[in-house]
Amino acid sequence: IEMTRGGTLENQHFGSVAAVNRRGDIRAYAGDPHWLTFTRSTLKALQALPFMEAGGVEHFGFTAKHVALMCASHSGEDQHVQTAQEMLEKAGQTYQVLRCGCHVPYHFEIAGKAPSPRETFDERYNNCSGKHAGFVAYCVQHGHSLDNYEAPEHPLQQAVRRDVARVVGMDANDLKLGVDGCSAPNYAMPLSRLALGYARLASGAADTEFGASFAQLSEAMTRHPDLVSGTGRNDLAFMQAG
């Protein structure tokens, strides 16, 4: 990607692409398919696996909307905040337990507007609040402390690391640890390994290890792309286009 200013080249951005089947075979690529990269928010659907595998959806009576929000980098619109609130209520908790922090919701930037000085925002407006509400629910279900659920050594995060490693076909100790913008652990891995994780996720019920969970996650995101994203965003348009 090239960016110009006044007709003169100012910036060049390079990237890599890897297309992988669910066996891990690289079928097509551009750039370096093994480039070591942090997964950031692409990891969210996989970070939900411990909750899904433990029967958390059924335990708390979550719907597809709640599952979709666990995978979201949402815009902090009313529907996103309300869905996060519902998840917390089902887990018997309030937004004060969320460890994601807060920021001005994305929908203001997308609309080209600034919030009123009178408006205040809490953790439910954070784009990662659904993921964190899922974290909280998992801890409640298993009797784990909520005080430091974002710490890498917490049983929740150990379960996340274990399941992510299984999905991408790596040893958990080989996942490179970092901290995401919402304070949760995040992992770097070769691009081809991340692509494998998404190939398996897309296979849904056909996956022999996580099929039931992948089917629920895929269906939820497909049915409720507006909860995964937000009004006016390109990724929402892509998802709605099928």
Per-region residue spans from a language model:
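Active-site SXXK
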Residues: T39-V57
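Active-site-adjacent helix/loop patches that line small-molecule binding or acyl-intermediate pockets
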Residues: T63-D174
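A short glycine/serine-rich beta->alpha loop
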Residues: A30-F38, M70-H74, R118-N126, G178-P185
